């Protein structure tokens, strides 16, 4: 009774007020799986292509074309297929699209159906998605990377770097980790208010204050950690997403807010100075996606001290990840479902990373919905780490709440990844 008997997609709205694709897959047993795809603000040049309408509706960002592909070609091709063979379903859609980057039908069309099929399979098996994808061994709750200060493409302020995160590695459970994060978030709001800084939030729910420098963002977070009663470098560590491709111009790393410009070696030294001075545990996209020589320098200098995550660098693509592994570039990959466009390919990237000794961080996008698939995915794959924003905005909090539910359902079997998620903490 696992045959696909119906597929339907619609245009819905994401957390930034832009359209996105939601799909429903119905099986012969009568169960239905539903999923909605996210969308990024800063995107890697080699990501799978998100199909937009480019007409007058929604400033050109409508997704009627992608929805039409789901309700037409994709539906016709998949009706009657066994949903339980997700790899075959995904493979059929990839074959149908016929392009290397899913540009004909749209990665947003393929991913909506792929995710919905996974949900339908889980419902048909009478189990939660994390158990269906991960089996009995899926008991590890991830350390959240909580983006509490937003800059770069995620905020309208003068901070160059995109995300300043807190990692509650010292918590004993995901529920406690969320509490740590929420208490620091509220303490930070008070710190910023006292300074006369804006407490408006960015796309991912973090504050987006105008600060005199990127380093000032670290300083206010450390103050908030202390005021909340936690110890930085023990209870809570720091993480950065530089999104360096966004300020890499003509071979230079240009921090406009500080009036500074660096070559690759200089920017590596700049980041190394921060690592030596602050309790930084992870740096994402420390170098630009096309600066592989710079990445090599960064990995050689800091790879033994901190987690170096490739996002725009690897774009959840196994071919690019393999090249990085072979060249000893970075030591971690950010996993975004919509960068590659199917669940099967996403799982393959996670498997490749883990096999090579790289960590895998499951991630949201800046444009999200109430869909919580990534929470289940983080547990299913035992990734040990998740990025899903700050402690505000329901599109972010929905994922934390799902992790709390999963932890409760697992009961005594549940394990919080904590310090064990990071080799750098021994």
Swiss-Prot record:
PROSITE patterns: ENOLASE (PS00164). Its cofactor is Mg(2+). Gene3D superfamilies: Enolase-like C-terminal domain, Enolase-like, N-terminal domain. Binds a second Mg(2+) ion via substrate during catalysis. It catalyses: (2R)-2-phosphoglycerate = phosphoenolpyruvate + H2O. Keywords: Cytoplasm, Glycolysis, Lyase, Magnesium, Metal-binding, Secreted. Mg(2+) binds at residues 241, 284, 311. Component of the RNA degradosome, a multiprotein complex involved in RNA processing and mRNA degradation. Catalyzes the reversible conversion of 2-phosphoglycerate (2-PG) into phosphoenolpyruvate (PEP). It is essential for the degradation of carbohydrates via glycolysis. This is Enolase. The gene is eno.
